[in-house]
């Protein structure tokens, strides 16, 4: 009898091969043939699921984004109601850590996601996913900032612009930490990432608290 292949699982195996190639050789090397070799498949097997390299890269970008967003949404669902609760603070740091290359799985995803976002500047077929995923991640960061900084004064007239600025500041910090950790892992260790992130969050709270 012919072997039954789980199509969803096979696609994820192929996406995994794409991410490994991006991490070791760069996105430009992620052709159908290179990905097939990395996945231990015939090129025809990859073509069964993806018509072209562009099709493969677009699918992989969405898959990586969705993995990140799934982890983020799962983590945000576990946040407690009190911004000053130590458990909530720890949960926030855990949630934001999903953006960062703190272990092998997250390092592969972070490397691929940043590479795809950069490539979207000059590859139009990636632009829609770059916009979608950025907006989705920004929405999660916005929820975190609102939870951390806005609960004490939910009706503050000037809170909106301040929260937007804080959210953009946090997004930029996360991008910078991820890039630094990927480029200089011997210096920006997982422990250093966590320490910098915790310091940043505490600094945001102090600045917002001082403004009230």
Model-flagged regions — what are they?
Residues 97-104, 111-122, 200:
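Helix-loop "lid/cap" segments that line or gate small-molecule binding pockets
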Residues 127-131, 148-212:
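Hydrophobic/aromatic-rich alpha-helical bundle segments in the mid-to-C-terminal region
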Residues 1-9, 20, 155-156, 208-212:
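N-terminal intrinsically disordered/low-complexity leader segments
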Residues 10-19, 35, 60-64, 68, ...:
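Generic hydrophobic, amphipathic alpha-helix propensity
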Residues 13, 17-59:
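Helix-turn-helix
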Residues 69, 105-114, 124-151, 195:
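Amphipathic alpha-helical packing segments from all-alpha helical-bundle domains
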Residues 59, 73-109, 167-170:
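Hydrophobic alpha-helical connector segments
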């Amino acid at each position: 009898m012919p072997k039954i292949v789980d199509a969803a699982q096979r696609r994820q195996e192929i996406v995994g091969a794409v991410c490994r190639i991006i991490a070791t050789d760069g996105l430009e090397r992620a052709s159908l043939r290179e990905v097939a070799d990395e996945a231990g498949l015939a090129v025809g097997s990859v073509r069964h699921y993806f018509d072209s390299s562009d099709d493969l890269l677009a699918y992989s970008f969405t898959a990586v984004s969705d993995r990140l967003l799934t982890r983020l949404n799962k983590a945000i669902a576990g946040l407690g109601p009190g911004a000053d609760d130590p458990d909530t603070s720890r949960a926030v740091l855990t949630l934001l850590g999903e953006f960062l290359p703190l272990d092998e799985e997250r390092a592969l995803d972070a490397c691929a996601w940043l590479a795809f976002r950069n490539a979207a500047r000059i590859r139009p077929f990636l632009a829609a996913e770059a916009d979608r995923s950025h907006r989705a991640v920004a929405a999660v960061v916005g929820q975190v900032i609102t939870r951390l900084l806005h609960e004490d004064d939910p009706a503050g007239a000037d809170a909106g612009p301040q929260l937007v600025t804080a959210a953009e500041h946090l997004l930029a910090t996360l991008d910078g930490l991820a890039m630094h950790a990927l480029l200089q892992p011997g210096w920006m260790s997982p422990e250093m990432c966590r320490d910098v992130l915790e310091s940043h969050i505490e600094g945001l709270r102090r600045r917002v608290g001082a403004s009230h």
